[in-house]
Amino acid sequence: MSDVSGVAFGVFIFFFLLVTVLGFAAARWRRAEALDHLDEWGLGGRSFGTFIAWFLIGGDLYTAYTFVAVPALLYAGSAIGFFAVPYTIVVYPLIFLFLPRLWSVSHRHGYVTPADFVQGRYDSRPLALVVALTGILATMPYIALQLVGIEAVLKAMGILGEWPIIIAFGILAAYTYSSGLRAPALIAFVKDTLIYLTIIVAVIVIPSKLGGWDAIFGAAEEKFTPGPGVILPATGQLGYATLALGSALALFLYPHSITGVLAASNRDVLKRNMSALPLYSLALGLIALLGYMAIAAGTKPIGTDANTIVPVLFQEMFPSWFAGIAF
């Protein structure tokens, strides 16, 4: 581990320990009489207001892998990687049509999961079991992608091997088991605040060091002109559109997405959040452009792992302590 990586790793460890303490302390935050009821443990007592729900749902949807992989896609494959931005914009008008109704029915009948809803509405345990198993199977690769994002960050700091990832996942699982949904809700405050801080600093500092946005887009155009080009060719537009639309239709079918929705205290909380959550999409659009910034800066990934391009870019552009905050 280099000295630079050592400083970044030290700051990273500080924030990791901070969120670990917050995760275990979350059981006492907005404390109920007991967490042994599924409503309290799994949905935070269905008591989250607009502010908390905004951080929780945003933190659930815009994950570590999202912020690592989307710029990596733009770095490696030009415009196709930008699909994540329109799909996270289109999704909110779509779900505005049915999520408030889903919340009302679930609140009235005490449903905690999508499988509970299906069993209650269709009186079919086999169908509810299929929905539950589908959710579990769909979530497994989703979790794996988050671990890939963590691995990319650790690799940039010179930390190799599987044990650091296993330990981090084990600690996360432990405080989630202990505190229920209150843990990710409380941690989302810290995580998302750091994300917005990092984005604001990055889009100001990095372009100023690289000669402005004109130089950044010029470097991207120079790289991709011999190949697919910065703009999608006509043959790729249908695939781009269907990828974005399909992703939007699927996003709130994931169990963790529905959990954040059902934890809201009332329908109006959801309506306000559907209006405010696109702020995360704006942030994602700026983060995606980090891929083009890496091209302009001449940044190279570690080995063949394009997912490391953003962590490496931050190590090159910022002091080690700020890189640690970003990580």
Which residues make up each language-model segment?
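Helix-loop-helix module between adjacent transmembrane segments
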Residues: 82-179, 246-250
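Membrane-water interface regions at transmembrane-helix termini and the short interhelical loops
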Residues: 2-3, 73-77, 101-105, 148-156, ...
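Small-residue-rich segments of transmembrane alpha-helices in multi-pass membrane proteins
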Residues: 50, 119-128, 191-205, 278-283
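Membrane-interface helix-loop-helix modules in multi-pass membrane proteins
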Residues: 40-110, 239-250, 257-302, 312-327
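Membrane-interfacial loop-to-helix junctions in multi-pass transporters
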Residues: 6-9, 47-50, 122-129, 158-167, ...
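Interfacial loop-to-helix junctions that mark the boundaries of transmembrane helices
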Residues: 1-11, 76-87, 154-163, 186, ...
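Hydrophobic alpha-helical segments and their helix-loop junctions in multi-pass secondary transporters
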Residues: 20-34, 99, 139, 143-147, ...
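Membrane-interface "cap" regions at the ends of multi-pass membrane proteins
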Residues: 1-67, 176-179, 198-202, 263, ...
